Regions:
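Proteins with a high burden of low-complexity, intrinsically disordered sequence enriched in S/T/G/P/A and R
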Residues: 1-2, 9, 75, 91, ...
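Basic, amphipathic "hinge/linker" alpha-helix immediately C-terminal to the N-terminal HTH DNA-binding motif
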Residues: 65-87
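Short, hydrophobic-biased segments on the C-terminal half of alpha helices
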Residues: 54-55
Length: 107
């Protein structure tokens, strides 16, 4: 797997590296949602950040706006399985990561 700056794999990592991209994609997995409903579903995201995120996802071809609601495109739907995999990994290893972050570091 090549992870150079201009490789396709790096592009995929960039799509899920943004804090809100995978959250918004996951929140749309059951179908279209209006901006306010999407914001309530997610929680903890400002209206401005949500707007910026859905616009970026639209630009990337992952989300489209139809009749005032945001929905995943077929391309966006292909991200659901990898996002679910990250969620499983976090559930299994999240405590280990937190423990590592809380270790006392040598001076």
């Amino acid at each position: 797997m090549d992870l150079l700056a201009d490789c396709p794999t790096r592009l995929a990592f960039d799509l899920v590296a943004n804090t809100w991209n995978p959250v918004v994609v996951w929140a749309l997995r059951h179908g279209p949602r209006r901006h306010g409903e999407l914001r309530r579903t997610i929680g903890g995201i400002s209206a401005k950040v949500l707007t910026e995120t859905v616009r970026r996802l639209e630009f990337d071809g992952l989300v489209e706006r139809r009749e005032g609601a945001y929905a995943l495109t077929p391309l966006g739907e292909t991200l659901l399985e990898p996002i679910e995999g990250f969620g499983r990994w976090a559930a299994e290893h999240g405590d280990d990561v937190v423990a590592a972050q809380n270790r006392v570091r040598p001076a």
